[in-house]
Amino acid sequence: MKLGALSLCVFASTACAFDIDDFLDRLDNTLTLSVFHDNVRARLSGTLDLEIYHFEQPPPGLINSSIDTLFNPRLTLFLDTQVGSQIYFFAQSRLDRGFDPSNHGAQLRLDEYALRFTPWDDGRFNLQVGKFATVVGNWVPRHLSWENPFINAPLIYENVTPIQDKSAPVSPLNFIYGLYYYEKYAFNPVIWGPSYASGISVSGRLDRVDYAVEMKNASLSSRPESWNVTENGFEHPTFSARAGFRPNEAWNFGLSGSEGPYFRREAEPTLPPRRDIDDYREFVLGQDASFAWRHLQVWVEFYEARFEVPRVGDADTFAYYFEAKYKFTPQLFGALRWNQQLFGNISNGYGRSVRWSQDLARIDIAATYRFTTHTQLKLQYSFQQETTGPGDDNHLIAAQLTVRF
């Protein structure tokens, strides 16, 4: 009797999923527009993400919540417009509780918008202007919920460090221990997620080599509100670049670099006398590789970063991760990621050399089941631990249901 009831529930759920899938297919056709003999094509699409997190306090990464269990819904809309073969425009807007998971109220944002000009069909040159993700590294192309094997980002993109962009430390000890006294969002990671800063980029592909160079209005570590050109102009630009080499279809190698000031304008009064924002910069050097063979995909990134910190000196850090995804069936795949971030030493102002933040390691395990071409469920467990100092740890359990249309 119980087996029959369970079979009936599974059958009903599957039938319901395919009914929704059929509706979303019809919706996709409705949201696609083509005019002027197909010379102008526009498509509106999106994803609805329903996320739930359970963690220990303080919350890991960029999660901003005073409660241990957080429900985080997000509606993302994409607009893609192609005019002829040379002009392309895209935009991304979101309705959620903040750029990063939080227990704040709802907010509507325009996260990305850009105009791209491609004069030649072979893709050797593209000129792009607007607000868009950084060209650095190989994680950004898969950072959206449908493509990302995990619910969160690698450690380097979300681990908050003692770096502050709104004020300068008054002493080395204030710099080292600031994380214990101020709320987490006063501080910055090395790279803040996909870094949707505003600017201009040039990119292209020449045979087996691809390249991208960008000038942005904010550094890779900058917070989301700094990415808007109305909030932060181009007085102190950041320059980033990536060069990639693909020897064959399976392998892809890349080298990235970035350099620019990381302080916001309001930090200027807190800087030492006769110093300005341009005197303190963030330097990032990155190496990445990816491999794909049959049902297996592997990604790896290494980052070396240096922050020039007032009254402290150079603060160096090294971070890396290995990520693997395996497709067990056309609908089920699993993923495993190992992350680590190590911090260098600075003078504490009293003749001793100390680590400027605790080294950290994290393992992420995730499984995704794709019910249809429009719906998927993702489950994740993460364990994070300090490998130096007191050895604090944190467990994260998360689930994400995504509907794509």
Residue ranges: model-predicted function:
Residues 191, 232, 313:
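Glycine- and other small-residue-rich loops at beta-strand/loop junctions that grip anionic moieties
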Residues 32-54, 65-221, 235-240, 244-252, ...:
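Outer membrane beta-barrel
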Residues 19-23, 56, 61-64, 103, ...:
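Outer-membrane beta-barrel pore domains
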Residues 215-236, 387-402:
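C-terminal/domain-terminus segments
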